[in-house]
Amino acid sequence: VKEGVFSEEWRKSVHILMGGFALLLRYLPWWAAALLAAGAVISNATWIPKLQGGALMRASETESLLRSGVWLYSFSILMLLVVFPQHLEVVAGAWGVLAFGDGFATLAGKGIGGPKLPWSAQKTWAGSTVFFGAGTLGGAAFGWWVASGTQSPAPSFRKMLLISGCAALACAIVESLSLKLNDNLSVPFLAAGLFYSLQQLDPAIWQASSAQLRHDFLVGLAVNLVFAFTARALRAVSWSGVAGGLLVGITITTFGGLSAFGVLAFFFVLGSAATRLGYAGKARRGIAQERGGARGAVHALANCSVAAYLAFLAGSLPSELQAGLWLAFVASLATAACDTLGSEIGPLASGQPF
């Protein structure tokens, strides 16, 4: 590594190697792990960025700690320790997905290259595939290692591998969307949330309601097909939007029935109407939604994937948790709809912005 010259390879090597500290969570008490993480937060804000003349840091990261992936990495781990003090296996699993999935994905994307993802010109199929594979193995290994030393009975490696695979897949998709949120925040928090919630699932609930789930799935399939193709005919969505909408819509209807679908449909119609409102004027000013206002799969997943997962949890967890989950389901869709309304109607207002 040349002094003062940024090296992506060195940065990601450090990113991956730091994941090894997650193995210590099997032996460390919570307070000791939190103190070490706090020390890392301080170090990554002070002397670590100066190593090799700043070769670990991208140029854009020198302006603010909130833009520094190096600092956000350690900050995320500290926050996970604060949120999950009794579930260090969750922290370890999420850490494994972050260290191995995100780390090896960048190296593979640059080293292997290959075709780009249809929805992101900056990401490759190779990178996302490696993210999923490496993240799955890293998360499962770290999560199981810590759980086997801190829980009794410990979950099987097979169960942890399945949970880690779901978390890594979700994180790989989020990472591929090139969101403004730094990957060192989005990946560990999403992975930890999935590790924790998926461990709480009760298969007995699915067995008891299997007939109802099959019925709601078939109803959801029919209703969502009609709704999606109607939206396509009205040019409210693109073909990728049809696919993304079917995925989240069928999931929501299967676990929440037609009432949950009605909430989804209401907010979709509301957002689509706001997009069409004053579209010609917005197009002349260059601020209109592209493709004539048709939303794609990225929009469907960004706006509705949280709601779909909450619906899945509401249908898979004990009844005492369901009211809160359905409230969160409505809130997540309302938040996405309000964001759309603000961005579509706001530009139509006259006067100076705040």
Language model features: what each stretch is:
Residues V1-W119, T124, S128-F354:
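Hydrophobic alpha-helical transmembrane segments
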